[in-house]
Amino acid sequence: MKKRTREQTGLIPRSILRTFERFRKQLLPGAEMLVIQEFRISRYQVIVSVRCLITLIFVPLFINILSKSFLIRPGIEYLWNQNHNEIFLNSYQENRALHDLHQFEEKVYFDSFVTDFAPSSNVLLQKQSVEIAKNYNLESIEAISNLFADFLSFLSLSVVFLLLKPQIIILKAFLSESLYSLSDTTKSFLLILGTDLLVGFHSPRGWEVFLEWLLRHFGLPENSDFMSLFVATFPVFLDTVFKYWIFRSLNKISPSTVATYHNIIE
């Protein structure tokens, strides 16, 4: 039977070992040339990483904005208004429109008592109904346009990942090195900040707002039962993943960070 190779975890953190190794190299003959070479490599790594990060962010963003503004939205708007008699994408959108109209009707009814002269309520309701219909018609067009534009952005991001594989490897190495170079207290602070934002005590409300925005962004029905189930289960799943990652990976990479993290939360 073949023995399984396991990664040995020493008592000394790897960051200290890397620092000691660099210090040892600086004492060797030709250390000046070595320092210059390391500086050039570091500068090249920073330049490539910044370019790669900018490309990953702005290329899909520009494709989304340009395709949506000049191609997708005009086409969707023409097809929707010419070949579609409906205004709403789903019943939840229609209920929101009726709720808005009902609120306006109550406001007109209240104003008719507090003002001496009030225009005809039927005329106001008719104008408001037309305005609400226009707004929700535009919301439906916007939701369908978002679906196609975001799909194109995802495709463009996938193509960028395929074309920039070497640069992405350098970017990952640069980000890892930058993260490992932080102090244990700073890394623990960022870890606590991330976990509290995603799975903390006040995170359910944030997940509700995010899920509501996401459903409206794509014109999907806002099912309260689904939202409650998602908010009740997804943060728990994320919390389990975080704890497993801390125990399985971070404890090997930087045990001092894990120790500092536990001291802070205690």
Curated annotation (Swiss-Prot):
InterPro entries: CemA. Signal peptide: none annotated. It comes from the Eukaryota. It catalyses: K(+)(in) + H(+)(out) = K(+)(out) + H(+)(in). The chain crosses the membrane at residues 46-66, 151-171, 226-246. It is a multi-pass membrane protein. Keywords: Antiport, Chloroplast, Hydrogen ion transport, Ion transport, Membrane, Plastid, Plastid inner membrane, Potassium, Potassium transport, Transmembrane, Transmembrane helix, Transport. Coiled coil: none annotated. The keyword Nucleotide-binding does not apply. It holds the Pfam family CemA. GO terms for molecular function: antiporter activity; proton transmembrane transporter activity. One of its GO terms (cellular component) is chloroplast inner membrane. GO terms for biological process: potassium ion transport. It is found in: Plastid, Chloroplast inner membrane. Belongs to the CemA family. Contributes to K(+)/H(+) antiport activity by supporting proton efflux to control proton extrusion and homeostasis in chloroplasts in a light-dependent manner to modulate photosynthesis. Prevents excessive induction of non-photochemical quenching (NPQ) under continuous-light conditions. Indirectly promotes efficient inorganic carbon uptake into chloroplasts. This is Potassium/proton antiporter CemA. It comes from Chlorella vulgaris (Green alga).
